[in-house]
Amino acid sequence: MKKAVVLLSGGLDSTTVLYLAKSQGYEVYAMSFDYGQRHKKEIQCARDVASGTGAADFVLVTTNMNAWGGSALTDNSIKVPEFNEESEKIPVTYVPARNMIFLSYAASYAETIGAYDIFIGVSEVDYSGYVDCRHEFIDSMEKTINLGTVCAVEHKKYIKIHAPFLYKTKSEEIKIGMDLGVKYEKTWTCYNGEEFACGICDSCRLRLEAFKEAGYKDPIKYKGEK
């Protein structure tokens, strides 16, 4: 069975990608990150998703990106904006070079275990404006990985980065996930790590609108819901 490293945050996108990779016959190795983000709730969700789907392994990487901050997700002094509060510019929830760092770790793990496929749940259609969710970045990272790994340079075994939802809307992604049996109640999207999702941050609003557009009710609980 082919092995694949799946970057798993515990959110909607990465969880759907993991289910998709499994449906395509891959033996899944999940990789998550404790990078000093605002809360750890998503990490537990990632762990639960990996366990519940029978992932071959779950690796948690610790890298303290909060040491330099630069994002509302790694610096508590920066307020998490509400939906559309920064619609014309890159939001303060962008974490500098995060996907570059994550994919570098994934490449190292993949080469070590003999996996030549990496899955990531980025989209350049329905996203918050993050520059590291674009196809130009994904294509460039794949090229860089294959220039800097022995498996590619010496053995001609090239690593492929799969971003299956790169050109899909979040609602299209949810429809695919529903067909795959994704347990969305086990995922966490909110930028805040409280008992219930806030429903007003950019991430929550994109999720809620996507479920509505897809014709489903979001199964997680939101603050203020009865």
Curated annotation (Swiss-Prot):
Entry GO MF terms: ATP binding; ligase activity, forming carbon-nitrogen bonds; zinc ion binding
InterPro entries cross-referenced by the UniProt entry: QueC (IPR018317), Rossmann-like_a/b/a_fold (IPR014729)
Record: residues binding Zn(2+): C190, C198, C201, C204
Keywords: ATP-binding, Ligase, Metal-binding, Nucleotide-binding, Queuosine biosynthesis, Zinc
Pfam family, one: QueC
Record bears the keyword Transferase: no
Associated pathway: Purine metabolism; 7-cyano-7-deazaguanine biosynthesis
Cofactor(s) it depends on: Zn(2+)
GO biological process, one term: queuosine biosynthetic process
Residues the record lists as binding ATP: L8, S9, G10, G11, L12, D13, S14, T15, T16, V17, L18
Enzymatic reactions: 7-carboxy-7-deazaguanine + NH4(+) + ATP = 7-cyano-7-deazaguanine + ADP + phosphate + H2O + H(+)
Record's cofactor remark: Binds 1 zinc ion per subunit.
Transmembrane segments: none
EC number: 6.3.4.20
Domain of life of the organism encoding this protein: Bacteria
Task of the protein: Catalyzes the ATP-dependent conversion of 7-carboxy-7-deazaguanine (CDG) to 7-cyano-7-deazaguanine (preQ(0)).
SUBUNIT field: Homodimer.
Family indicated by similarity: Belongs to the QueC family.
Protein name: 7-cyano-7-deazaguanine synthase
Gene name per UniProt: queC
